[in-house]
Amino acid sequence: MFTETACASAPGDAGRPNEDLAVAGPSWVVVIDGATAPAGVDSGCAHDVAWLVARLGGALAARLSADAPAPVPTPLPGLLAAAIADTAGAHGSGCDLGNPDSPSATVALVRAAAGRLDYLVLGDSPVLLGLAGGGVRVVADDRLERLPGGRPYSLELVRRLRNAPGGFWVAAARPEAAAEAVHGSVDLRAVRAAGLCTDGVTRLVDWYGWSWDDLAAELETRGPRAAVEAVRALETARGPMRGKLHDDATAVWARLPGA
């Protein structure tokens, strides 16, 4: 069980919905980052990315809550696969779930159960494990950064390699993507807290010179809101390395007993 869970989230553009989501229970935390479709692209779906994020978050929350009393917890990839299937089933007959531009999202997830802290990362929203002995362990899925040819990626390359061997994996309409997530567990006594961030917050590390230890310290001492404010200040002062000035930004810091 977590003793305290703090969260902050801010949209990248006040005129658009926030396509990030954070949801938490007594023993678990989920952070989801919806992938904004490029302008003019036909997703083949009647729903937008915010709909997918809300549906997937609700399905994961329901699955995690129902599984919490189980003496032997269901592995996180299995829960995510079921939640993706639940979400796919909520689409209507007019939605083309085979469209390579259909709505998708990254998922970061932690759960305290049976003396372990389980973690799962699918896409570029990492988990930071604050270790009981000091320091931080980063659980990240960097496959999106290792596509052939380097950035900027063409739309056709992303379409071809999304949820494909040798490419990158996200939560969309294929439950089998969950098996490709980075996942594992550690002894609960070895961890004092867990941080989960979307890439709108990890810009601090990726673009602006912070270390992962710096980010974990900010989350632990000043809180998620301060981390979001820090990235906004740097974006305004220095500009983005690529893409839009501001992205949706979400951070969570969940403390464990003894922290």
Stretch-by-stretch model annotation:
Residues 1-259:
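PP2C/PPM-type serine/threonine phosphatase catalytic domain
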